[in-house]
């Protein structure tokens, strides 16, 4: 639904739900959305930033509160749930990470829970939050941060920088350079080929991390929007639409959990490889 309340065409409805609330600086001051078409890189997706940061703060608050109140006696339901997640992530790290680094488990826990919480926003019916925002004069609102490629690439670039950092820290600058130039063919004549292959492999890691998460969540959100569009026109079709939405919702719970798990596991594996001194 548009902020002004006018009826949207099917194409407009889809486009509206897939458009972020954008803010940019222009010669005339701050501008939003259509006025930001020429701003390029310096356009801020306010909704993605709000929900991603907000969910991150919520995650830290919940886990910190549970940690402070944890007792050796009979735990409450929330404490049991948090302990189950922590144990699951800790076991995943033990199985996949072969170096020694006390920061990997907390990092993996943060990635898994944070990405899952951002993905879980996809469970909210597609019209609820945009409609509530339109009542407050906000023309666009995209509530699922991981359907914004800027967010997924930000996460992936963070992981990429950690890969570079730990590769240099563990192997040294010379060791890192040798890894790029003397593998997989250990001969000086093959240095250009090795450098090309290893550079492509290295750069492919964050790109695959970002696009996999973005693609799966974007497609899932689009299916929710299409179901709402096709079956929301009358009462009879709405009944069928609710059934389809519920079916896709149940399946999508698996998707959002799996994508958070994959992002976490690949991060662990990549950092484990960075700690391996060849």
UniProtKB/Swiss-Prot annotation:
GO terms for molecular function: proton-transporting ATP synthase activity, rotational mechanism. One of its GO terms (biological process) is proton motive force-driven plasma membrane ATP synthesis. The keyword Transmembrane applies. Key component of the proton channel; it plays a direct role in the translocation of protons across the membrane. Its main location: membrane. F-type ATPases have 2 components, CF(1) - the catalytic core - and CF(0) - the membrane proton channel. CF(1) has five subunits: alpha(3), beta(3), gamma(1), delta(1), epsilon(1). CF(0) has three main subunits: a(1), b(2) and c(9-12). The alpha and beta chains form an alternating ring which encloses part of the gamma chain. CF(1) is attached to CF(0) by a central stalk formed by the gamma and epsilon chains, while a peripheral stalk is formed by the delta and b chains. This is ATP synthase subunit a. Keywords: ATP synthesis, Cell inner membrane, Cell membrane, CF(0), Hydrogen ion transport, Ion transport, Membrane, Transmembrane, Transmembrane helix, Transport. The chain crosses the membrane at residues 43-63, 104-124, 148-168, 191-211, 222-242, 249-269. It is a multi-pass membrane protein. It comes from the Bacteria. It is found in: Cell inner membrane. PROSITE patterns: ATPASE_A. GO terms for cellular component: plasma membrane; proton-transporting ATP synthase complex. Belongs to the ATPase A chain family. The keyword Flavoprotein does not apply.
């Amino acid at each position: 639904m548009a902020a002004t309340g006018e009826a949207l065409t099917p194409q407009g409805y889809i486009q509206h739900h897939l458009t972020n609330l954008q803010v940019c600086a222009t010669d005339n001051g701050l501008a939003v959305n259509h006025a930001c078409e020429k701003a390029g890189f310096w356009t801020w997706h306010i909704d993605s930033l709000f929900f991603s940061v907000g969910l991150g703060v919520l995650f830290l608050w919940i886990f910190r509160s549970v940690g402070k109140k944890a007792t050796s006696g009979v735990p409450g339901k929330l404490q049991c749930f948090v302990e189950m997640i922590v144990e699951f992530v800790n076991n995943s790290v033990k199985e996949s990470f072969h170096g020694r680094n006390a920061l990997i488990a907390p990092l993996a826990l943060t990635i898994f829970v944070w990405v899952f919480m951002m993905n879980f926003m996809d469970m909210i019916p597609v019209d609820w939050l945009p409609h509530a925002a339109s009542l407050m004069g906000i023309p666009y609102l995209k509530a699922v941060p991981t359907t914004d490629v800027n967010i997924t690439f930000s996460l992936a670039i963070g992981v990429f920088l950690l890969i570079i950092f730990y590769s240099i820290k563990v192997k040294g600058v010379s060791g890192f350079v040798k890894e790029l130039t003397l593998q997989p063919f250990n001969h000086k004549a093959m240095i250009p080929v090795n450098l090309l292959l290893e550079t492509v492999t290295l750069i492919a890691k964050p790109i695959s991390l970002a696009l996999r998460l973005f693609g799966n969540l974007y497609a899932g959100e689009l299916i929710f929007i299409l179901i709402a569009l096709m079956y929301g026109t009358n009462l009879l079709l709405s009944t069928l639409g609710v059934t389809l939405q519920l079916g896709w919702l149940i399946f999508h719970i698996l998707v959002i959990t799996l994508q958070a798990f994959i992002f976490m596991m690949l991060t662990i594996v990549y950092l484990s490889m960075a700690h391996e001194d060849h």
